[in-house]
């Protein structure tokens, strides 16, 4: 009895040394050499008789908690963009986006939403899974994109890829946003048709004096007053086909889009 216990201890110790040196296969080879066909005692003790050194889900790549809780790169870019000087904005945003994409680069292929939503997720998916950029290249690719387009100056679809938005499209979008945001400032006056009162005389006109026909006094035209110099003539929205240029150019959304157009 003591001899069996002693042999078992020696085998366990040899298995531990073999596994530490050669891995799990070394322990199995030692058992076969010693004639222990029952398998590796250490394997049965640790519950690894199925041949897997780790549980099935442990080796999978998981997103760290600090990345799951952090805002997306799109949110970071759009938040910092209004705070920067327009002349240096794209360059600073390029560095910022490149660093944030590099932190998430290993997980973007499976989780493009880490980059953002809409065209940002599309760009991450396109660069990772279609263009097959390596994780260490994604930061530079996104940085070059933001340097030339800004946070919103690009479009993306999985067929045509990532493309820069044309400047004319940005200008038209700015005008559309400005028109949607401005309030109507001209009251509409309903037009009524003036009808001459007619008397019910059975369809007969009253007799008139043929010798002295009535005459209607003609209004005398008033002379046009000259406009004094230095006085600005203010145009109404109706004079510009319903487009209030003053409100449009004073709209912050239009000014931001116009600055992006000039910077690109």
UniProtKB/Swiss-Prot annotation:
Main localisation: secreted
Signal sequence interval, chain numbering: 1-21
Q: Which residues are glycosylated?
A: 209
Residue ranges under compositional bias (Pro residues)?
214-226
Q: Where is the composition biased (Polar residues)?
A: 230-247
Name where it's found: Secreted
Question: Spans of biased composition, class Low complexity?
Answer: 190-213
What domain of life does the UniProt record list for this protein's source? Eukaryota
Region described as Disordered: 182-247
Provide the tissue specificity.
Component of the acid-insoluble and acid-soluble organic matrix of calcified layers of the shell (at protein level).
Record GO cellular component, one term: extracellular region
Q: List the disulfide bonds.
A: none
Q: Which UniProt keywords apply?
A: Glycoprotein, Secreted, Signal
Name of the protein: Uncharacterized shell protein 13
Name the source organism: Lottia gigantea (Giant owl limpet)
